[in-house]
Structures are given as C-alpha cells and as structure tokens.
C-alpha cells in the first residue's frame, strides 16, 4: 500500500458525507443523544440528561457518527446560557455591541461532540450555512476551549458576553455537569 493509498483510506474514513438535522423522535436521534451523553460522561464526568431540540449530526461515508451539535431557537424559549446572564441574551448582546439584535434572529448552540479532530469545524461550517439560509444572525453558546479553537481556525470572531458561572445553576444541575466548568 502506497502513502497515497493510506491517505485515501484515511480520508474515506474521516471525510463527512452526510449531515442530518434530527428533531425529537427522529430515527437516529437516540443514537445521537447516547453519543453526546457518553462523551460528556467520559470527558467531564457529566450526566447530560437534556438535549437541545434539534441535533445536527455528521456521518462518515460508512455511516459512522462523527460529530453532533444541538441548537435551539431563541424566539420563544429561554436559553440555557441565560442562567449565566443578568438580562435576556438580546439585551446583553446589545450592550456589548452597541446596537440591538432581535431575539428571533438568534439560536443557542450546544451538545457539541466530535469523535475525530476537525469534526467541529465541519459542523460549524454546515451550521453556519444552515442558519444563514434560515435568516439567523447570531449563534450564542457556552464555549469550552475546544469550541473556541474550532471557531478561531475558521477565522470566526467571537463576542464574549461573560463567564459561565457554575454557581448560577441549581445544586442538582451543578452535580450533573461534573467537571465541565473546569475546562
């Protein structure tokens, strides 16, 4: 086997071939949630029990699940990350930017898990295209180092709004998140 054959084999195993958006009850949703749960348990000792309403799932050509991320429209729902803020996300963002953004133009992103390096960048690119096509202007999220790095590699500028303070969660929720807040 030549070096070129090896490279092609590696690419065939790691280049995403399909992106799906799964809502509750959709085929494959349970597997995606189990994938997220397992990753957070291994990485942070967390016991994730709630998943965002829509999961974007990245599959390799052979069907292997490579990465997931979830998102929720801000229009009608309180966002998980608003627990860390003293005001609604649109007000916090307006104070930071100097102009007002409408809540219905925002989505919250979370449940990010990648099996292989680079998976986050593929999903972020796919999510960006999807959200732009759907008329969204802002994706808001709590960013661990891995996510900040993925955005940096894509030359996406982040607008920090404040720290994710674990003490703002109720006691049970703090336990469920394990060591996540230490990253």
Task: For every predicted segment, state its role.
Residues 17-21, 71, 158-160, 164, ...:
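Generic preference for hydrophobic/aromatic residues in regular secondary structure cores
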Residues 12-14:
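Short alpha-helical hairpin
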Residues 165-183:
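Accessory, usually C-terminal, subdomains that scaffold auxiliary metal cofactors
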Residues 16-104, 110:
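A conserved beta-strand-loop-helix scaffold within acyl/acetyltransferase catalytic domains
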Residues 41, 85, 137, 181-182:
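Compositionally biased, intrinsically disordered low-complexity regions enriched in proline and serine
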Residues 58, 62, 135, 157, ...:
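Alpha-helix boundary/capping detector
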Residues 82-171:
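Acyl-donor binding region in acyl/amide transferases
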């Amino acid at each position: 086997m030549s070096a070129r054959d090896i490279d092609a084999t590696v690419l065939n195993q790691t280049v995403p071939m399909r992106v799906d958006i799964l809502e509750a009850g959709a085929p494959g949703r349970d597997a995606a949630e189990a994938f997220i749960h397992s990753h957070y348990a291994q990485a942070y000792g967390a016991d994730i029990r709630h998943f965002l309403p829509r999961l974007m799932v990245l599959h390799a050509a052979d069907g292997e699940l490579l990465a997931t991320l979830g998102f929720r429209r801000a229009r009608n729902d309180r966002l998980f990350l608003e627990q860390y803020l003293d005001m609604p996300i649109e007000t916090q963002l307006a104070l930071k930017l100097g102009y007002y953004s409408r809540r219905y133009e925002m989505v919250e992103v979370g449940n990010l898990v990648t099996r292989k390096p680079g998976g986050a960048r593929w999903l972020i690119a796919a999510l960006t295209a999807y959200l732009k096509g759907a008329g969204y202007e802002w994706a808001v999220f709590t960013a661990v180092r891995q996510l900040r790095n993925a955005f940096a590699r894509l030359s996406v500028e982040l607008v920090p709004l404040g720290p994710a303070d674990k003490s703002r969660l109720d006691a049970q929720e703090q336990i469920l998140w394990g060591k996540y807040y230490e990253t």
